[in-house]
């Protein structure tokens, strides 16, 4: 009850004032307006680092490890995404890592099967065998219908269209592997004609007689 | 995992393995266990990149995989091992220890295995022999047998161990009811009985010297040779990894011996070293104290160059037992006295000394006096602190409150009355060693993270200058190889101007300081981690 009376003993606190560390008349420390500084000044200087042969050897080891780990195959860099325009320098920068290859061969028996990245061989042989595999049943099918020549001719036309479709699908599926092959074709074509003349403007007349081979109805003049 | 540990792991992964692995690793740490698809979705990376990163992490033992929550039929879940990533900070120390114990050969063996994660014995031997031959003078080459003997010694003293085998290979013979899972949990390496058994391999030959002029051809020939050679050795599928626990026991022993040598004298340090060496094989990793050794055994096992008489040895042992640090304890009287080394208590004392020294260096010796007082006397009121520490009241108050704001000292209220009136409550200050040690450990992780970031910042700021100096060094090296004149060399050297040279020099100095700081903080981290682990093991 002594502390609850408002009138008497108004300036009494409920605890021992001396324990606060300052008297009643002293000024309070200034209020802070900003957060404390990021690098507050230190009261005591830090002790200098150890020195000695052991320390320097470990320092050299650390720096060597750091430098050599950048050259190991474990240092993974993402393949650069294709920019919008193909550039001349792309032909000379084939050292870039591809995302779907792994540069070292771990012991696959110690890793789960889903992590296995099969390194794909160059695409030419695989597409060649695929095309051969798919051609053989179609060639066998066409051999069975030799009796009707018109139908075989029509089927050959259909087969070539289907092969083109399969070729397009393969191109869509295996973008990266086919593009270097396709680019190589373009490069070869460009290298063959080193002149300034655009190849498509020049018509060397080879296609003149060949177009009319299929339709023998019209007479040749 | 705490935020500081996650940040430090991310920085270490980025330094050694690049941004992609850092991205994958950080997501795995934050999310606990993840499947491959979930991880690819979270990190928004290509699936192949995620697969490659996981291969790298598993190869280095930082990630383990196991059957998921849906059992063996469900997708595989990956779980990251943060301590392994933090061990990367300590690689130079492991390599230096191997060098001091087993020479250059041992050093290179441990370095190769640390950098590659796991290796077979034959490939390690070949690579190390080639590297040693490269550094030897012309005409000499390193014989494989020497490297094999160094490897065997490392395995015999348990510094290297076999990687635990995958159980899926052995379970293929079971019945159809349990289909062999695509993957199983790898067991603890120590539980495998052949953990430290050396395989029999037929490997003989010399290290090959690689000539710098025919680098390309030699690489191709070496690659082809590697393919044919690997089929000859008989240790397929037996991979070796570094046994970090054994290195940590060695570091702990070193810390105890150096503490005893500093506190007492060199001879006491030697006696404790002898005791620890004798109980290496008989003491398990988490034991609180070594096996009891009699004074007679210690006397016989002392190194021969220490000619201590028997009574003097007894006096030293009595001194060690009576020392307040309690490194050595007396366990009995038979055989001239049975003595043990108190490992856990030694670690606790070393951690306490570290805490006291940190307070002393940051807040001054008077604050350290208050801190030590509270450590010993447990709970004290403010008035008692002032009296026992013999510090004037105002300063003592200020120091106590500074320590309190840094969380190094805790405040405990004990009310006398149910209404917790401040004038009728005891306020007691106390220091708890274990939580304070944990707090300091987090500060250490943050420190190392800051040091690494500052080093990356310094390197990035001066990237142009560093690249220029690297190019000039390459030009100089190629000129010297082709035998250029001195004038040409000086011309090339002058391409770097004097102020640039100064800038480079100061940059090198800063980076050396930061790296050295990282190594030193790592020593504190090791001490605090060992102490915290020892308290957890004893519970």
UniProtKB/Swiss-Prot annotation, chain B:
List every stretch annotated Disordered. 165-234
Q: Which Pfam families match?
A: HTH_9, POLR3C_WHD, RNA_pol_Rpc82, RPC3_helical
* Keyword Nucleus (UniProt): yes
Biological processes per GO annotation: DNA-templated transcription
Q: Which keywords label this protein?
A: DNA-directed RNA polymerase, Nucleus, Transcription
Task: Locate the compositionally biased regions of type Basic and acidic residues.
Answer: 212-230
Cellular compartment(s): Nucleus
Locate the coiled-coil region(s) and give their ranges: none
Q: Which GO terms describe its cellular component?
A: RNA polymerase III complex
What protein does this entry describe?
A: DNA-directed RNA polymerase III subunit RPC3
